[in-house]
């Protein structure tokens, strides 16, 4: 996790691409998109099925995710750092055996990075649907800002693609080769 000195460099600046895009309340419409992509990952799906209260408190789950996104983007470095530590700590004890009989841990780098990546995709895709067109340079800036935000929760740079175009390839590969259709996907 980042030091206090590093926090200011990780939080998007006021008026940045991420700051402007993520502030559109209409992007809430992408929450289901992100959640479905997240839980389709076998590790995330197992953790959600075994530990999450989404089934009994879906609105609470949504609000906690919104608190995370809004707090890390708009809350300033100190709040963003505290949120990052809390998210990491909450996930530290989430582990078990998935539906395929394989052991999992919520902090597996691939799965943890995937959750972060789905939020970027949701913001981008939902924003695009509402007319937030971005130039190639803006997409790249957004992705670099989003990668830095990932460091707040301990997502390592090496677990996310370096550039937006690489992200698109990574995203398609994850959907094609890693995500699974299992009961948790249908429950959310």
Predicted regions mapped to residue ranges:
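Mature, function-bearing regions of proteins
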Residues: 1-188
């Amino acid at each position: 996790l980042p030091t206090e000195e590093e926090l200011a460099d990780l939080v998007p600046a006021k008026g940045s691409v991420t700051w402007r895009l993520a502030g559109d309340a209409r992007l809430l419409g992408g929450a289901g998109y992100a959640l479905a992509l997240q839980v389709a990952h076998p590790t995330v799906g197992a953790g959600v099925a075994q530990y999450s209260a989404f089934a009994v408190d879906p609105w609470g789950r949504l609000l906690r995710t919104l608190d995370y996104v809004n707090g890390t983007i708009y809350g300033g470095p100190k709040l963003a750092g505290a949120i990052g530590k809390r998210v990491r700590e909450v996930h530290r004890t989430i582990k078990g055996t998935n539906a395929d009989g394989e052991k999992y841990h919520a902090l597996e780098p691939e799965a943890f990075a995937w959750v972060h990546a789905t939020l970027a995709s949701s913001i981008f895709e939902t924003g695009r649907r509402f007319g937030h067109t971005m130039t190639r340079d803006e997409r790249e800036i957004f992705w670099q800002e989003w990668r830095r935000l990932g460091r707040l929760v301990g997502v390592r740079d090496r677990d996310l693609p370096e550039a937006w175009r690489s992200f698109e390839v990574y995203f398609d590969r994850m959907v094609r080769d890693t995500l699974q259709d299992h009961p948790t996907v249908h429950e959310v």
